[in-house]
Amino acid sequence: MALTQLGNHPKEELALVEIATAILSEHKTVMPFSSLVEEIQDFLAVDAETFQSRLSQFYTDLNTDGSFISLGNNEWGLRAWYPVDAIDESIHEIDDDDDAPKRKKAAKKVNVFADSAADDDVIDYNDDDPEDEDFGEVTEEETDVDVDDSEVEVEDDEEEEIAVGDDETIDDNLTELTGTNDLDDLSDGDIEK
């Protein structure tokens, strides 16, 4: 679709991605995003301030629309121009520059508490691992506890006194409850049959 074919439609009703597709088809080459935006502004005959409010949505549509492809350096083209294999190759060409592995030196650990490197009195805190400590092992010697039965005092008198007094009150409460139905108090007024 060329810009001349878009002239038949009202410009306000056209989507910006449709206009971008027509512009890229007419130029038949990739374009930087800024040039593409300028071409769209010229076609719509709007100034930059008016177009600014639609710019972020246009960029989002450009990324999500399947008919466009970003070729790096903010250059855009039509996906139809590139077969799938060529797309992979062009992406890998950009990545080839970054293939040289960059190795970083491991940071040497320094003990800030040491006066000198040869100081033997310094505690090495790197060897302390709280997960290595064994708190769960218990020997038989630790579990054997000698208890003398004569030292343990049990007071049976109090339990007997409580038991006698409680039997009478429990029986009284049971006789009071047997005649009532607690669910009747919560009913909505319907009579049970």
Swiss-Prot record:
Transmembrane segments: none annotated. One of its GO terms (molecular function) is DNA-directed RNA polymerase activity. It comes from the Bacteria. The keyword Nucleotidyltransferase applies. GO terms for cellular component: DNA-directed RNA polymerase complex. Keywords: DNA-directed RNA polymerase, Nucleotidyltransferase, Transcription, Transferase. GO terms for biological process: DNA-templated transcription; regulation of DNA-templated transcription. Residues 14-81 form the HTH HARE-type domain. Gene3D superfamilies: RNA polymerase, subunit delta, N-terminal domain. Pfam families: HARE-HTH (PF05066). The keyword Cell cycle does not apply. Residues 119-193 are annotated as: Disordered. Participates in both the initiation and recycling phases of transcription. In the presence of the delta subunit, RNAP displays an increased specificity of transcription, a decreased affinity for nucleic acids, and an increased efficiency of RNA synthesis because of enhanced recycling. Belongs to the RpoE family. RNAP is composed of a core of 2 alpha, a beta and a beta' subunits. The core is associated with a delta subunit and one of several sigma factors. This is Probable DNA-directed RNA polymerase subunit delta.
